[in-house]
Amino acid sequence: MSNSSSSSFVIVGFEYKGDVKQFRDIVFENFDVSEKYQKEIDKYVNDEYESYSAYYELCSILEKNGIDSIRDDKILIGKKLVDMDSDDSYVPDSEHDIDQLVQTVRDIRSKLNIETPIKIYTGTEQC
């Protein structure tokens, strides 16, 4: 549950200790997202933060900025299972294929050539 200035999340993913721009470049080089999201990418080409939305369908990126539960030296990368904003008073119904989630996260992790464990992260981020 969140208050008026925060959003709660549940994400299946892993910790990444690298630069978000570097991660974004790896995603565009290794996954077929550029064509699908090119219009969105072009729209936000000068706004680095907004351009992340172009590939959020593939993965979610959570940085320290505004998230108390994330240390300064890490980024969480994975798939969001729940993302509640201040207008939500309950957790929305959803169903997830665990095998598919884990495989997607493994694919992303493999492209980054890192071996950090896949975990479930929960927390609250500022809106």
Across the structure, where does each feature detected by a protein language model lie?
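Low-complexity, serine/threonine/proline-enriched polar segments
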Residues: I26-S89
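Short, extreme N-terminal segment that most often corresponds to the first beta-strand
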Residues: M1-E29, K119-C127
